[in-house]
UniProtKB/Swiss-Prot annotation:
Name the UniProt record assigns to this protein: 5'-nucleotidase SurE
Cofactor: how bound: Binds 1 divalent metal cation per subunit.
Gene3D superfamilies according to UniProt: Survival protein SurE-like phosphatase/nucleotidase
Originating organism: Methanococcus maripaludis (strain C7 / ATCC BAA-1331)
Residues that hold a divalent metal cation according to the record: 10-11, 43, 99
Length: 264
């Protein structure tokens, strides 16, 4: 039976990572792959939705002349409109990526790539998010001018994806992160989220009118514990596969109840 796959991202409809994944998935599987992605770069926007402005869907041609749908909103908007207006049904899978830059640790809550995947899971689809490590920041923001090679990552994602076909999906979202030196033979490691991916840095500058403004930046964390996604990708140079859930309830719920319930 032909699968329905909704392919989204947060880097924009014309991302080469999106195109590489579409082509590899489309060639490998009996699937209808529908691309619905933001008109513009939406990195760092998390699972935000547009509530105070209308959204538009524009049919467009990708670099390989195939058809896609550009949405004037966030990655989560793309999933919502992709399901309710383009497909008019919940697909079998929502796949988000390939993101330019890794999405690791608890900072995944800021990721538009993960936001889209969680929205797909929220609608009842099986969801995967996939990201490629990029160690030079300027490559993240000048994709069209950079030598980033996505085909290997797309094939790795395909191989991971195949492991779940025919089985009951193991979690709400599977988060896949690929190191920048990976090959199709790079080991795959099942991991947990690290506490953090970056050490935050705020840079203050002064504009021509002597007013302060700020750039937010971060330095990559390397010293997370073994078994985490950060350690797997940055230290061991393995592909990281992390099972994620929509349920953000603290693991110590019973202990919390026992300690605090009588105080309310």
């Amino acid at each position: 039976m032909t699968m329905e796959i909704l392919l989204v991202n947060d880097d924009g409809i014309y991302s080469n990572g999106l195109l590489a994944l579409k082509n590899v998935i489309g060639e490998e599987f009996d699937a209808n792959v529908t691309v619905v992605a933001p008109t513009n770069q939406q990195s760092g926007i998390g699972r935000a939705i547009s509530l105070f402005e209308p959204l538009r869907i524009t049919k467009t041609k990708l670099a390989d002349c195939s058809e896609g749908y550009a949405v004037s909103g966030t990655p989560t908007d793309c999933v919502v409109l992709g399901i309710h207006q383009v497909l008019k049904k919940v697909p079998d899978y929502v796949i988000s990526g390939i993101n330019i830059g890794e999405n690791l640790g608890t900072e995944i809550t800021t990721s538009g790539t993960l936001g889209a995947a969680f929205e797909g899971a929220h609608h009842g689809a099986k969801a995967l998010a996939c990201s490629l490590q990029v160690t030079m920041d300027h490559l993240k923001f000048k994709e069209g001018e950079s030598p980033i090679e996505f085909l290997t990552t797309a094939r790795i994602v395909k191989n991971v994806f195949k492991k779940f076909l025919g089985d009951e999906f193991p979690c709400d979202v599977v988060n896949i992160n690929v190191p920048d030196n990976a090959t199709e033979n790079t080991p795959v490691e099942i991991t947990k989220l690290a506490k953090r991916m970056y050490s935050m840095h705020v840079e203050e500058r002064i504009d021509p009118r002597s007013r302060s403004y700020y750039w937010l930046d971060g330095y990559p964390v390397m010293d997370e514990e073994d078994g985490t996604d950060v350690y797997a990708v940055r230290n061991k140079r393995n592909v990281s596969v992390t099972p994620l859930t929509l349920d953000n309830t603290a693991k110590n719920l019973d202990e919390f109840k026992e300690k605090y319930a009588k105080k309310f």
